[in-house]
Amino acid sequence: LLLLIRIFEFAVMSKTILVTGGAGYVGSVLIPKLIDYNYNVKCLDRFFFGREFLSQQKFKGNLELINDDIRWANSKIFEGVDIVLDLAALSNDPVGDLDSQKTFEINHKGRNRIARLSKENGVGRYVLASSASIYGQQDNVANENSSVKPLTTYSKANHNAEIDNLLLDDDNFTVTALRFSSIYGVSPRMRFDTAVNKMVLDLFSKREISVSGKENKRPFIFIKDAVKAYLTIINAPKDKINGQIFNVGSDDQNFTMGDLANEIVHSIDESCKINIQGTNDHRSYFASFEKIKTILGFTTDYGIKNGSIEIYQALVDGTISDNIKTKTVEWYKY
């Protein structure tokens, strides 16, 4: 048994993972966890939002930082890489709409380039970070076989990347696309331009939450559970994930925006006010997460209640704070 454990530890330690966009909101939580599990990590990023949180002494020897762009990075970055987690992207709808051409260049063409180069350079496994936003507007709960209705540049680019990258899978190259719910939670590269994070910030700073489109539907997932999903895919048998798309989230975190605000207020401070506003946002969908649960046994550990409390406590403690870098579209404009 001890011999088997040592063989397993060696196998894990010998694996190298390239994370594109590794200094982003999710990547900066994911990479320390990968290092905790003894993976060697290469982080490819433009570092628009800084790199301090990935330059800590404890990461030395297990982490290589590569300041480059997925659109033209040299193929040498794939040397010795076993797995690619492709998170690099202009990261939401408002940012995507700032420059539609650049969004397609990066989120579609750039990530397809990374997938093709991964295959050409002998990488065994490639994971695309996609988004459930490609469902757009749905009357029924959307599963992986539902028709997609991407309504924005960001979601259209994600859909294009899925189509092109999944065509590359074969017996030697495992390709998986993960359609993530809207992610919330604390990160070293903090964002307050996502629904839950923004609501908690408003509650903390203004003691009221503004809700645009209270009937609009969305699925949500805590950032630590998003990281857990990547670890699940990394370790899954390839016959269960090759050429597959998985929605990532939990059925109990499908919320209308109005119900989401109520859940956050009830979790943190019931005396806070909720202001309902109109919206021109036509995105509205719930998603099913039965596939990832049934095939891979993936379940989430966090919900809106304990997740929003963690964000609020971090604001109280001062470990996170609001600044221009936490509003992605404002930082790019700046």
What are the functions of these language-model segments?
Residues R207, V211-Y334:
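C-terminal substrate-binding subdomain of Rossmann-fold SDR/epimerase-dehydratase oxidoreductases
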